[in-house]
Amino acid sequence: MKVVILNDAAAVARYGADLFIRQIHKKPDSVLGLATGSTPVALYKELILAYREGRVTFKQVSSFNLDEYLGLDAAHPQSYRYFMNEQLFNHIDIDKAHTLVPPGDAADPIAACALYEKAIAQRGGIDVQLLGIGRNGHIGFNEPSSSLMSRTRVKTLTRATIDDNARFFAPDEYQPHLSITMGIGTILESKKVVLLATGENKADAIKATVEGPLTAACPASALQLHEQAVLIIDEAAASKLSDVEFYKHIERENQKLLDRLGY
C-alpha cells in the first residue's frame, strides 16, 4: 500500500486526477471505477479542466460506479447517476452509454447485481478504481462486518452512514436505507485502487486502514492486500498515523527512484 500525504484537499485532487489522466494516456480505452460523495468532486473538476484544456479525452473510456441507492431512479436528484452526470459526465466527451451505475430502480436488484458483475468482467475488469472512505472505514457501501470477499450485492446502510448522508436529503424527503454496491472482493480485483481522504474526520479511518489489522470491522483495511493500492490523503486525514514523516520519507525516496528510471 502506497501512502501519499499532501498539504491540503486541493493537492489531493490534483494528484489523484493526474493518476487517472496518465492511465488514459497509457490506455485510451481504460475502464474506470468511479465514486460519489464530497471528496471525489474536486478530482472530477480537475478532470473536467484537463479535458477543456485538451490534455485528455474520454471518448474511448468506459466507467463503472461503485454504488447506488436502492429505490431511487436515475432522474432523482439524489441518485448517484444524477450526481455523476452533473459532476462529471455532462462536462466531458465520454459516451454515456459506456458509463454504468448500478440500477437503483431495478425490479429485481439481486439479478441486477449479478448482471453488473458480468458487465465488469466483459469489459476486462477495472483498470483504476477510485474510492472515498467513510468515518467508519466503509468503502462503497461496504459497511463494517462486510465480507472481505464480497461481490456486488444489496447492502443495508448503517445508521452512521444514513446520518452522514442525511444532509443531502430534505427533512421530509424519502432517504433510502438500502443500496447496491460493488463488493470488497470486486474492488480488490481492480488493477489499481486510488483512495482519497481529506479532513480530520477521516483520520481514525485512515489510521485503521493503514496501521490497523486486516478486519471486516474496517472494510478499507482490505486494501492492505492490494499490490497497487494508493492512498492520497491530506495532512489532516494523516494526523493520527504513527509516523507521518516516515510515510513522507518513503514517498520521496520512491519518487526519486521512479524519476531516475524514467517512470
Swiss-Prot record:
GO terms for biological process: carbohydrate metabolic process; glucosamine catabolic process; N-acetylglucosamine catabolic process; N-acetylneuraminate catabolic process. The active site is at D67, N136, H138, E143. Belongs to the glucosamine/galactosamine-6-phosphate isomerase family. NagB subfamily. GO terms for cellular component: cytoplasm. The keyword Membrane does not apply. Its EC number is 3.5.99.6. GO terms for molecular function: glucosamine-6-phosphate deaminase activity; identical protein binding. NCBIfam families: nagB (TIGR00502), PRK00443.1-4 (NF001684). The lineage of its organism: Bacteria, Pseudomonadati, Pseudomonadota, Gammaproteobacteria, Cellvibrionales. The keyword Hydrolase applies. Catalyzes the reversible isomerization-deamination of glucosamine 6-phosphate (GlcN6P) to form fructose 6-phosphate (Fru6P) and ammonium ion. It catalyses: alpha-D-glucosamine 6-phosphate + H2O = beta-D-fructose 6-phosphate + NH4(+). PROSITE patterns: GLC_GALNAC_ISOMERASE. InterPro entries: Glc/Gal-6P_isomerase (IPR006148), Glucosamine6P_isomerase (IPR004547), Glucosamine6P_isomerase_CS (IPR018321), NagB/RpiA_transferase-like (IPR037171). Keywords: Carbohydrate metabolism, Hydrolase. Homohexamer. Pathway: Amino-sugar metabolism; N-acetylneuraminate degradation; D-fructose 6-phosphate from N-acetylneuraminate: step 5/5. This is Glucosamine-6-phosphate deaminase.
